[in-house]
């Protein structure tokens, strides 16, 4: 450990940074990402004009957390005037986009099949469609409850994926353009290759613009959520390295589900688990204390569900938790 004064062990720094537009909460499955992202959104709602909370995790836990049904449209969270939530499936939104815009007949379908044969294009376009939708809604700050680590940073490769798709379509168009146009005139309809090309190009522009914002520490930060165990800490280190390689700012770690046994408690399992957690917590401090705000949150005796419990829990993000003596 260094002699430097440790950073404030709260997420107050995020609330104070008014320039932030995009905040991601990510980590391994089951470490409390959703509770953390919901709690952070609640705290942001108290100091920012309007907040949108988005789940891109296929499990979609926002509805469970707030005990309120959310879908693909931004819906006001009960009890708030300026906090909205939505649950989206990138692949689902892509399918809807195709179905609603496929007016080009059979050849249009063929061009889409050719484009989607490139790995990742479907996800990339789904993500672009979501970002287009989100950008059209004027929110002060957007909080992402992301899919478990591994899927979290997939979107960073999307611009190059779409570049490949554009290149492939362009080549195909050059080779088969006259034949496609002849067949198209027989089938009737518009020019599918140009339509598809224009669609991919507009998606690529959106993703490139958004990715540039994601790499701006004034606009974007990533909150790593973990528990004090070997695998979770290892995953967090990998996540931080990956974020650093993509130039995405991260300087907050939430360590969730910590045990604080009461004095005189004879629970052997609690004691063993507490000692294990303290060992990995020390490792986390050794690794990150100089550059990260490390927030410690307790293991609770009941689930954090419903607005009131989330509000109560969210206070621990801005005021360090003190275990009862």
Curated annotation (Swiss-Prot):
Binding locations of ATP: 28-35, 229, 256
List the subcellular locations: Cytoplasm; Endoplasmic reticulum
Q: What CDD domains is this protein classified in?
A: ArsA (cd02035)
Task: Please list the GO biological process terms of this entry.
Answer: tail-anchored membrane protein insertion into ER membrane
| Residues annotated for Zn(2+) binding in this entry | 267, 270
Kindly state which keywords UniProt assigns to this record, in alphabetical order. ATP-binding, Cytoplasm, Endoplasmic reticulum, Hydrolase, Metal-binding, Nucleotide-binding, Transport, Zinc
Q: How does it assemble?
A: Homodimer.
The name on file for this protein is ATPase GET3
Q: Per the UniProt entry, what species is this protein from, by scientific name?
A: Cryptococcus neoformans var. neoformans serotype D (strain JEC21 / ATCC MYA-565)
């Amino acid at each position: 450990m260094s002699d430097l004064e440790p950073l404030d062990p709260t997420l107050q720094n995020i609330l104070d940074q008014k320039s932030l537009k995009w905040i991601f909460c990510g980590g391994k499955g089951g470490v409390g990402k959703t509770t953390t992202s919901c709690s952070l959104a609640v705290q942001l709602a108290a100091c920012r004009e309007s907040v949108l909370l988005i789940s891109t995790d296929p499990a979609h836990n926002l509805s469970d957390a707030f005990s309120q049904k959310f879908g693909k449209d931004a819906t006001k969270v009960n009890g708030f005037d300026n906090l909205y939530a939505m649950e989206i499936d990138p692949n689902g939104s892509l399918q809807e986009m195709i179905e609603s815009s496929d007016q080009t007949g059979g050849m249009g379908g063929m061009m889409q099949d050719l484009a989607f044969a490139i790995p990742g294009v479907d996800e990339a376009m789904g993500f672009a469609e979501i970002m287009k939708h989100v950008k059209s809604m004027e929110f002060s700050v957007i909080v992402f409850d992301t899919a478990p680590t591994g899927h979290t940073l997939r979107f960073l490769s999307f611009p190059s994926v779409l570049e490949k798709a554009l290149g492939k379509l362009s080549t195909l168009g050059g080779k088969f353009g006259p034949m496609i146009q002849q067949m198209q005139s027989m089938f009737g309809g518009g020019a599918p290759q140009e339509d598809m090309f224009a669609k991919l190009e507009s998606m690529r522009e959106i993703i490139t613009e958004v990715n540039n914002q994601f790499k701006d520490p004034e606009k974007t930060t990533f909150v790593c959520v973990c528990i004090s165990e070997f695998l979770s800490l290892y995953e967090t280190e990998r996540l931080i390295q990956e974020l650093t390689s993509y130039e995405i700012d991260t300087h907050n770690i939430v360590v969730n589900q910590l045990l604080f046994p009461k004095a005189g408690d004879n629970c052997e399992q609690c004691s063993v688990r507490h000692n294990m957690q303290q060992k990995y917590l020390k490792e986390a401090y050794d690794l990150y204390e100089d550059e990260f705000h490390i927030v410690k949150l307790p293991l609770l005796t009941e689930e954090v569900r419903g607005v009131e419990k989330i509000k109560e829990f969210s206070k621990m993000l801005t005021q360090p938790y003190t275990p009862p003596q």
